[in-house]
Amino acid sequence: MPDANTADPDIATPQLMKEISAAFNSRDVDRIVSFFTDDATFWLARGPEPVGRTLKGKETIRKTLAARFAVIPDMRWDHKEYIFAGNRAISVWTVKGKGADGEELNYQGCDIYTFRGGKICAKDTYWKLVEHKDRL
């Protein structure tokens, strides 16, 4: 157990969350994945599984984010709030951007992070779905 003078690397902190948020907003994939453990799991909000889409491992996360930023090069998160509980943190945000096809992206959501050794070992993304009037 760490003493009062030693920070516990598993505890999520406001500073760490701000650094992770800045990395995502930089869209620098190498910078982003430096915050993940090699064996991290990232569940995307959308995908073919009940959990969305499961990404396993740093390299899979890197490739997926690189592809996402190629399609939405100006993607940007505005973090509204962080909630902390031991080695977990929740980030509440709005994300905006414009796809290569010209479609505007504007979602509200949150990420649930789990940390191990000062790095993200799990990230689970949720967002609100926007239903268009003609689809209701």
Give the ranges of each region predicted by the language model:
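Short, low-complexity N-terminal intrinsically disordered segments enriched in polar/charged residues
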Residues: M1-D38, L136
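A beta-strand edge to alpha-helix "cap/lid" segment located at domain peripheries
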Residues: P2-A12, R62-L136
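Residue-level detector of alpha-helix boundaries and kinks
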Residues: N5, M17, R46-E49, K98
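Short charge-dense sequence patches
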Residues: D10-A22, T41-L44, T60-T64, K119
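Short, mixed-charge, low-aromatic patches
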Residues: L16-S26, P50-G52, A67-A70, V92
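Generic helix-packing signal
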Residues: N25-R27, L44, Y113, W127
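A solvent-exposed, acidic/Ser-Thr-rich amphipathic alpha-helical stretch
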Residues: V29-G86
